[in-house]
């Protein structure tokens, strides 16, 4: 049992002094015990707030875990009690406050590698103690590491800690501080003790560099970098420091170095000679004596829902806990946003604000988090130009060539991966827009060339970026990533955002499930599913609302309906499966020749039950075991012409028996409206231009869009995979999402068709011969594509 006899069991037995910190559910005060005259920190948790949000059991969970612990590197919980209004936790007082605040305000510069090794040794010793008892902390950060009077590091704040039943047990909860959260936690994959190892890597990087490895101006971009494990290793670090950081920040948790190996790493030899040796030894029989039984009721495994404080004059760690995916959780997430607003939960902090878990879909909080208090230094720190950009080097590996025009710039990704930005200004003397500035960035983001073509005049806008100028001066126009002047950072950020957008639309893994075709994009966050029934599941960046569309392309507003629940359940399963596939292939790719790549990759195939035997090409060998067909249509051929439609409606007999001028004109028009151009566009489908100006695109998923010129009435016709054809008279914003997605490919299609050669006369004749002269509804013709 806890040695509580020396500490008071009521608040009256303490002399409460000044406030140390305040949050949404609790306040922390410095106090002195009237019995022992010892200074302590008392956290007062408002019972009304935790009962109102169903977080009572989570408070007990934190108390249960923390009260069992006693180790030199763990902040001690002396005792706890309650009255009618509050739950009181009597904690060890850390006189020198948070490590984060000490580094930024007292030192105003990073730690030396020797001091960082000393701090790391104490933190690792404390984590080894926790892990030996199957306790996962899940929120190791500089704000949760406190400094005692003798400058010993103490692990604090067990609000997110969880008790594992066995060392290999996995959890699915997304929680923690964004700058220190692991990729598997962000991706909502199963995670275990290795998540704390990742946080140790972020901690070491922050100690020796002065800022977290994945720090950005916004929570969302930070999480994106964490998922991609993109960080910059400064050149001034020693080889030992770089090696240990890289081993700690392995994206695959199974590849990370163990905590025992950290203590034996050569970097730890930099530790100061007078540093205290590790006091952890799990092999000693008495080691478990410190792991004492908790008072009170045992509770189910789950997160604490409170904000904890335990440092001198510290600000709150301000984290919003996610709900465990367990039936034992009984919190009411709908009430949390109201409490956050009423009690000032989102307070500015010099450290990255925690990521609000999926309890609210309001993106306003994201904007607040991304706009304040995310600098790695305090306001008193001097921000020099030598500091690096808050965006990692871009990377265009596997991205296809593309070109996109905005009002003021034209952005391109070339075939060899180079990114080109052409900035456009209107020249009144020439009465046209001209390219006045050009920024070229290598595919790995390391080399940047900036120049002005034909100064004063600029270049005319062309279909392709202009070639690099041969007369560019060396150090005035050519930079590397680390030496890029701050005046050009916006250009680089502009390019990085463009590459990020392209990644969010470029499939990395295509997976055919039993119900849908799934695309996991290159950024490892965006995920889309096109159900074979016509429905759609769209998952984008963390914090943005999941979007579901029914078979008719209408957005589902009620995500609690049975249809939406089934789609969400299947979507989450497929997303996790694609992430696991990606991790496995990346592991195989790392062990193989670096010149070989596994991506993009297609896994599985569309179920054969969706394709009837009669829909297959006779005499053709289906190399992918799958044939897609467009649904039944009243159009006798792939050509969308009014004469063909009329011919279909009247039947073949009416055509053969009528010799009127109108019929002859219809037949003549039908024969004239033949394909004149046809190309196969990778990742899009087969595009055809007809002699009457109609442009048809047969997509690889079996759907089709026909763009009708104004002379023939205008508009477009969209045919779904399930056979439903819809005519839209205008290209307005009311189009269904499926149509808008496909229309986004049309500029590329038209550009490719413009450059495509005309079909030969032999090819035209073959096509005319293959086109049915007439078709009745009882004998439909199917347009088929074999992939």
UniProtKB/Swiss-Prot annotation:
Q: State what this protein does.
A: Serine/threonine-protein kinase that plays a central role in centriole duplication. Able to trigger procentriole formation on the surface of the mother centriole cylinder, using mother centriole as a platform, leading to the recruitment of centriole biogenesis proteins such as sas-6. When overexpressed, it is able to induce centrosome amplification through the simultaneous generation of multiple procentrioles adjoining each parental centriole during S phase.
High-level lineage = Eukaryota, Metazoa, Ecdysozoa, Arthropoda, Hexapoda
Q: Does the UniProt entry include the keyword Nucleotide-binding?
A: yes
Active site residues according to the UniProt entry: 139 (proton acceptor)
* UniProt source species: Drosophila willistoni (Fruit fly)
The protein's name in its UniProt record: Serine/threonine-protein kinase PLK4
Return one Gene Ontology term, BP aspect.
Answer: regulation of centriole replication
**CDD domains under this entry?**
POLO_box_Plk4_1 (cd13114), POLO_box_Plk4_2 (cd13115)
Q: Which residues form a coiled coil?
A: none
Q: Does the keyword Kinase apply?
A: yes
Q: Which PANTHER family match?
A: SERINE/THREONINE-PROTEIN KINASE PLK (PTHR24345), SERINE_THREONINE-PROTEIN KINASE PLK4 (PTHR24345:SF91)
- EC number per UniProt: 2.7.11.21
**Which compartments does it reside in?**
Cytoplasm, Cytoskeleton, Microtubule organizing center, Centrosome, Centriole
All residue ranges annotated as the Protein kinase domain in the record? 14-268
Q: Which residues form the Cryptic POLO box 2 (CPB2) domain?
A: 506-613
Q: Which GO terms describe its molecular function?
A: ATP binding; identical protein binding; protein serine kinase activity; protein serine/threonine kinase activity
The record's account of how the chain is modified after translation: Ubiquitinated by the SCF(Slimb) ubiquitin ligase complex; leading to its degradation by the proteasome during interphase and regulating centriole number and ensuring the block to centriole reduplication.
Q: Could you tell me what reaction this enzyme catalyses?
A: L-seryl-[protein] + ATP = O-phospho-L-seryl-[protein] + ADP + H(+); L-threonyl-[protein] + ATP = O-phospho-L-threonyl-[protein] + ADP + H(+)
Chief place of localization: cytoplasm
Q: Which family does it belong to?
A: Belongs to the protein kinase superfamily. Ser/Thr protein kinase family. CDC5/Polo subfamily.
Quaternary data: Homodimer.
Q: Which GO terms describe its cellular component?
A: centriole; cytoplasm; nucleus
The POLO box domain, residue ranges:
675-755
């Amino acid at each position: 049992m806890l040695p509580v006899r020396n500490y008071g069991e009521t608040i009256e037995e303490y002399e409460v002094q000044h406030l140390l910190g305040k949050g949404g559910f609790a306040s922390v005060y410095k106090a002195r015990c009237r019995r022992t005259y010892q200074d302590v920190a008392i956290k007062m948790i408002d019972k009304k707030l935790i009962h109102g949000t169903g977080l009572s059991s989570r408070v007990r969970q934190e108390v249960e875990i923390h009260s069992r612990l006693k180790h030199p590197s763990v902040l001690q919980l002396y005792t706890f009690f309650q009255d009618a209004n509050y739950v009181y936790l009597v904690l060890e007082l850390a006189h020198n406050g948070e490590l984060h605040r000490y580094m930024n305000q007292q030192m105003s510069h990073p730690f030396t590698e020797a001091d960082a090794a000393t701090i790391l040794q104490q933190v690792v010793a404390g984590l080894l103690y926790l892990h030996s008892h199957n306790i996962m902390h899940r929120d190791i950060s500089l704000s949760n590491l406190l400094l005692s009077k003798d400058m010993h590091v103490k692990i604090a704040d067990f609000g997110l800690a969880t008790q594992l039943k066995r060392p290999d047990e996995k959890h699915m909860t997304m929680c923690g501080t964004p700058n220190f959260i692991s990729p598997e936690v962000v991706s909502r994959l199963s995670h275990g003790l290795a998540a704390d190892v990742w946080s140790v890597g972020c901690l070491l990087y922050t100690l020796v560099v002065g800022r977290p490895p994945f720090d950005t101006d916004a929570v969302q971009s930070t999480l994106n970098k964490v998922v991609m494990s993109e960080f910059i290793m400064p050149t001034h670090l020693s080889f030992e420091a770089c090696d240990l950081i890289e081993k700690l920040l392995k994206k695959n948790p199974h590849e990370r170095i163990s905590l025992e190996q950290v203590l034996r790493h050569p970097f730890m030899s930099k530790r100061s000679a007078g540093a205290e040796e590790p006091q952890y030894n799990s092999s000693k029989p008495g080691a478990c004596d410190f792991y004492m039984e908790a008072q009170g009721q045992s509770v189910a495994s789950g997160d604490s829902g409170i904000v904890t404080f335990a440092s001198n004059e510290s600000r709150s760690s301000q984290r919003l806990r996610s709900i465990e995916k367990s039936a034992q959780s009984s919190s009411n997430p709908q009430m949390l946003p109201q409490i956050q607003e009423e009690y000032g939960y989102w307070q500015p902090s010099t450290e990255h604000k925690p990521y609000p878990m999926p309890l609210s879909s309001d993106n306003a909080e994201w904007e607040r988090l991304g706009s304040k208090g995310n600098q790695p230094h305090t306001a008193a720190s001097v921000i020099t130009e030598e500091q690096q950009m808050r965006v990692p080097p871009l990377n265009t590996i596997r991205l296809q060539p593309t070109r996109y025009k905005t009002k003021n710039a034209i952005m391109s990704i070339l075939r060899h991966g180079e990114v080109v930005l052409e900035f456009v200004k209107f020249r009144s003397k020439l009465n046209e827009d001209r390219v006045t500035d050009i920024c070229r960035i290598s595919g790995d983001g390391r080399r940047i060339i900036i120049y002005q073509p034909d100064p004063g005049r600029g270049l005319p806008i062309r279909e392709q970026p202009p070639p690099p100028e041969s007369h560019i001066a060396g150090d005035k126009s050519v930079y590397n990533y680390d030496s890029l002047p701050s005046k050009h950072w916006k250009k680089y950020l502009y390019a990085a955002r463009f590459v990020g957008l392209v990644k969010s639309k470029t499939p990395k893994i295509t997976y055919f499930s039993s119900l849908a075709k799934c695309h996991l994009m290159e950024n490892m966050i965006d995920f889309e599913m096109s159900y074979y029934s016509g429905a759609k599941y769209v998952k984008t960046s963390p914090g943005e609302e999941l979007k579901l569309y029914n078979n008719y392309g209408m957005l589902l507003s009620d995500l609690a309906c049975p249809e939406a629940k089934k789609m969400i359940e299947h979507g989450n399963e497929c997303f996790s499966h694609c992430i696991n596939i990606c991790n496995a292939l990346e592991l195989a790719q790392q062990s193989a020749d670096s010149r070989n790549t596994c991506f993009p990759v297609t896994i599985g195939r569309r179920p054969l039950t969706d394709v009837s035997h009669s829909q297959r090409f006779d005499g053709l060998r289906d190399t992918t075991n799958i044939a897609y067909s467009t649904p039944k249509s009243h159009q006798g051929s792939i050509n969308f012409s009014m004469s063909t439609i009329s011919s279909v409606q009247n039947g073949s007999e009416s055509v053969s028996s009528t010799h009127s001028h109108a019929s002859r004109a219809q037949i003549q028009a039908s024969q004239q409206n033949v394909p004149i151009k046809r190309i196969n566009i990778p990742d899009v489908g087969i595009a055809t231009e007809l002699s009457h100006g109609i442009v048809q695109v047969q997509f690889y998923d079996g759907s089709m869009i026909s763009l009708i010129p104004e002379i023939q009435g205008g508009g477009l016709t969209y045919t779904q995979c399930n056979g439903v054809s819809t005519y839209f008279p205008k290209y307005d914003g009311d189009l269904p999402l499926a149509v808008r997605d496909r229309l986004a490919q049309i500029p590329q299609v038209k550009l490719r068709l413009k450059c495509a050669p005309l079909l030969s006369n032999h090819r035209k004749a073959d096509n005319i011969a293959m086109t049915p002269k007439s078709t009745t509804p009882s004998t439909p013709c199917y347009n088929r594509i074999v992939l």
